C-alpha cells in the first residue's frame, strides 16, 4: 500500500483564503497533526460524522469539515490524507488477560486443526527453553480439534518430556498438565478433588492431566499462577507486554482492562511507563483471591496507588480495582446455574448445575469481600457466567452499595452470560442510582466458543445468551471485551459478533443464539469505545473523538457504518494513534 502520510508546507495566504463555503476563515493556532478527507465516526452524543480532525499536544483541538480543518495547518503541521478511509476512536477491550497471555504460548490459532498440531507447537516452544523450564500455553479448544477430545498428559509427554507443561483451555476454567507437571505439583491417584474443582481421571482413577476449575490451581501453584510473574525474567515479561501492545495497535486498539494483576506484574508496567514505552492504556484489575484476608491485602496495596480516575502517566496506567470469581465457565459446564446444564444441545447433564467458585462455602465470603472493597471505595469486577451466579453478584453489589452509599465505583458483572429478569432489573437500578452494575460482556464467545456454548446452554437458554437488545431497551450500558486468550483479541471480531451472533463451526446451525438479541453496528461500536472507556474510568479522556479528548484514533480500510455487517470481521486497520502519536501504520 502506498504511504498516505505526507507533510504539507503551505503559504499562510493560501490557508487564509480557504474557508468553508468560500468565506475567509481566521487562522487558528497551527496543530501538530491534521487528518483530512476521511469519514470520521466520532461516537459523540449525536454519533456525528466529520471529515477531519486537528490534534495538538496529543489532544483533539478540532473536529469538522475539511475546509475548516485547513485553518489548523501551519508550516510544521503534519497532514494525513485519509483518502476516504474511516477513522474511529481507538477500540477498547474491557476484559482481557493481557499481560498474563503475553507470557504464554498461544494455542488459539485457527491453523491448529488437531492434537498433532498442538504437540508440534508445544515442542517448538519447549525447544527454545532450558530443560526443566515451565511451558505455559492457552487457547486450546477440543471442540476445534479433529479428535474432539481433551488433550491429555500422555499427548504432552510426547512434545516436552523434559519440561513441565500446563496448557489452559480457551475458557480459562480448565487445563491440561503433562506428567512432569503433575509430578512436580504432587498430583497423584490419591490426590482428592479440591473444593470447587475436579481432577479428571481415567477408568483406573489415575489423573489424565485435565484439571478443572480449582483443581487447576494445584498445577498453577507450580507454574507461577494466573496473573503472576510465572517465574519469567523481568525483561522477558516486559518484552512480552510490549509485543502484545504492538499487536493491539495493529488491530486499532488503544486501551485495555487487564485482569488478574498482582504487585509484581504492576511493577513491570510501571517500569515500561517510566521508559515511555506504553502504546496501550492499561486499567489493572487486581486478583482478590478467595478469602477475607486476601481481599484485605489487595485493599492495603491499592491504598498506596492513585485511585481511578486518577492515573499514572496521564491516563496510561490505572490501578483499577479488585477481581473476584463467583463461579466457573460455560465451556466446562461449571457455571453456577438454577437448572441442570445441557450437553450436545438437547441432552441434559443430569445433576450438574455447576457450582460456586472456591467451593460451596464461598458465596457468603464473596459477599463480605464485596462489602469490604466497596467500603474502601474500590471498583469490583466479578466473574459471573451462570444465571444463579449473576443474581448472587448483583444482589451482593446492591447490598454493599446501599449499605455504604457508595456512588460511582462502577462495579461490573464480568461475562454476564445469561442474566435473569431479576438481574437485568437490578443492573438497571444500580446504573441509574449508583453508577454501578455494568456487564462486561464478550460477544466473541458466541463465535469462537459458540458451538461448545450452544451445546452446553441448550436451545432455550441459547436465545437469552448475551441479551444485548434487551439490555439496550432497558437503558443498560455494557462494555465489550475479548477475554483473551479465551478468544482472539481483535475487537473487530467483537463488533461483528455483537451484530451477527454467529458461531465458528455451525455445529448446531449458524445462529443457535438467534438474532432477536442482535444490535446494530452503532451500538456495537459504543460498547467497544465510549461505554468501555467508562469502565476504565476514562470516558472524559477517550472513547469518542471530541475536542479536548486524547487523540486515540483507529483508521480503517472501510466505513464501519456502511459496509454489510458480515464484513466487520474482516476490517483492516491502516493506522493507529495514541495521544496523537502514530503507534502503528500499515505498509
Language-model region placement:
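Bacterial N-terminal signal peptides
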Residues: 6-18
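Signal peptide processing junction and immediate N-terminal pro/mature segment
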Residues: 18-27
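Phosphate/diphosphate-binding loops
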Residues: 279-323, 410-428, 450-478
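Acidic (Asp/Glu)-rich catalytic clusters
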Residues: 272-276, 306-314, 402-406, 427-436
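A short acidic, amphipathic alpha-helical/loop segment
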Residues: 155, 267-272, 392, 396, ...
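Divalent metal-binding segments
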Residues: 26-36, 41, 45-303, 318-320, ...
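His/Asp/Glu-enriched, well-ordered alpha-helical/loop segment
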Residues: 371-381, 388-411, 416, 421, ...
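Positively charged n-region of N-terminal signal peptides that target proteins for export
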Residues: 1-4
Amino acid at each position: 500500500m502506498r504511504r498516505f502520510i505526507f507533510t504539507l508546507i503551505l503559504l499562510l495566504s493560501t490557508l487564509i483564503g480557504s474557508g468553508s463555503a468560500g468565506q475567509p476563515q481566521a487562522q487558528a493556532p497551527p496543530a501538530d497533526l491534521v487528518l483530512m478527507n476521511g469519514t470520521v465516526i466520532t461516537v459523540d452524543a449525536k454519533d456525528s460524522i466529520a471529515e477531519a480532525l486537528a490534534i495538538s499536544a496529543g489532544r483533539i483541538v478540532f473536529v469538522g469539515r475539511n475546509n475548516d480543518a485547513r485553518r489548523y495547518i501551519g508550516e510544521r503541521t503534519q497532514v494525513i490524507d485519509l483518502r476516504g478511509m474511516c477513522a474511529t476512536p481507538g477500540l477498547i477491550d474491557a476484559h482481557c488477560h493481557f499481560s498474563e497471555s503475553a507470557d504464554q504460548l498461544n494455542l488459539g490459532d485457527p491453523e491448529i486443526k488437531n492434537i498433532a498440531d498442538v504437540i508440534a507447537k508445544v515442542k517448538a516452544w519447549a525447544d527454545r527453553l532450558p530443560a526443566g523450564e515451565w511451558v505455559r500455553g492457552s487457547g486450546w479448544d477440543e471442540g476445534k480439534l479433529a479428535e474432539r477430545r481433551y488433550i491429555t498428559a500422555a499427548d504432552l509427554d510426547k512434545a516436552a518430556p523434559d519440561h513441565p507443561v500446563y496448557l489452559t483451555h480457551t475458557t480459562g476454567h480448565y487445563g491440561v498438565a503433562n506428567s512432569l507437571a503433575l509430578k512436580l505439583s504432587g498430583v497423584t491417584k490419591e490426590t482428592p478433588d479440591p473444593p470447587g474443582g475436579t481432577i479428571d481421571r481415567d477408568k483406573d482413577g489415575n489423573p489424565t492431566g485435565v484439571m478443572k476449575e480449582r483443581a487447576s490451581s494445584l498445577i498453577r501453584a507450580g507454574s507461577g499462577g494466573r496473573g503472576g510473574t510465572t517465574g519469567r525474567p523481568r525483561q522477558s515479561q516486559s518484552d512480552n507486554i510490549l509485543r502484545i501492545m504492538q499487536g493491539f495497535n495493529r488491530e486499532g486498539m488503544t486501551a485495555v482492562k487487564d485482569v488478574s494483576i498482582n504487585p509484581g506484574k504492576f511493577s513491570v508496567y510501571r517500569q515500561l511507563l517510566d521508559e515511555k514505552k506504553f502504546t496501550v492504556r492499561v486499567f489493572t484489575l487486581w486478583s482478590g483471591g478467595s478469602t477475607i484476608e486476601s481481599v484485605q491485602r489487595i485493599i492495603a496495596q491499592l491504598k498506596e496507588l492513585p485511585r481511578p480516575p486518577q492515573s499514572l502517566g496521564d491516563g496510561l496506567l490505572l490501578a483499577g480495582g479488585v477481581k473476584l470469581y463467583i463461579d466457573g465457565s460455560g465451556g466446562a459446564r461449571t457455571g453456577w446455574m438454577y437448572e441442570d446444564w445441557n450437553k450436545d444441545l438437547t441432552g441434559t447433564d443430569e445433576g450438574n448445575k455447576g457450582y460456586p467458585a472456591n467451593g460451596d462455602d464461598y458465596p457468603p465470603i464473596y459477599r463480605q469481600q464485596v462489602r469490604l472493597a466497596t467500603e474502601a471505595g474500590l471498583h469490583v469486577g466479578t466473574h459471573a457466567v451462570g444465571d444463579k451466579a449473576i443474581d448472587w453478584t448483583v444482589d451482593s453489589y446492591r447490598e454493599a452499595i446501599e449499605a455504604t452509599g457508595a456512588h460511582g465505583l462502577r462495579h461490573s458483572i464480568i461475562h454476564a452470560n445469561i442474566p435473569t429478569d431479576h438481574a437485568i432489573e437490578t443492573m438497571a437500578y444500580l446504573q441509574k442510582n449508583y453508577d454501578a452494575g455494568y456487564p462486561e460482556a464478550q460477544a466473541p464467545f458466541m463465535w469462537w466458543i459458540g458451538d461448545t456454548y450452544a451445546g452446553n446452554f441448550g436451545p432455550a437458554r441459547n436465545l437469552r445468551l448475551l441479551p444485548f437488545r434487551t439490555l439496550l431497551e432497558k437503558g443498560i450500558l455494557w462494555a465489550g471485551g475479548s477475554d483473551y486468550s479465551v478468544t482472539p483479541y481483535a475487537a473487530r471480531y467483537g463488533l461483528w459478533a455483537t451484530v451477527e451472533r454467529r458461531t465458528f463451526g455451525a455445529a448446531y446451525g449458524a445462529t443457535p443464539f438467534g438474532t432477536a438479541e442482535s444490535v446494530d453496528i452503532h451500538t456495537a461500536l459504543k460498547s467497544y469505545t465510549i461505554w468501555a472507556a467508562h469502565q476504565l474510568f476514562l470516558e472524559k479522556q477517550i472513547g469518542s473523538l471530541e475536542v479536548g479528548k486524547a487523540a486515540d484514533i483507529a483508521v480503517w480500510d472501510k466505513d464501519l457504518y456502511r459496509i454489510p455487517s458480515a464484513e466487520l470481521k474482516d476490517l483492516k486497520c491502516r493506522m493507529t494513534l495514541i495521544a496523537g502519536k502514530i503507534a502503528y501504520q500499515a505498509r
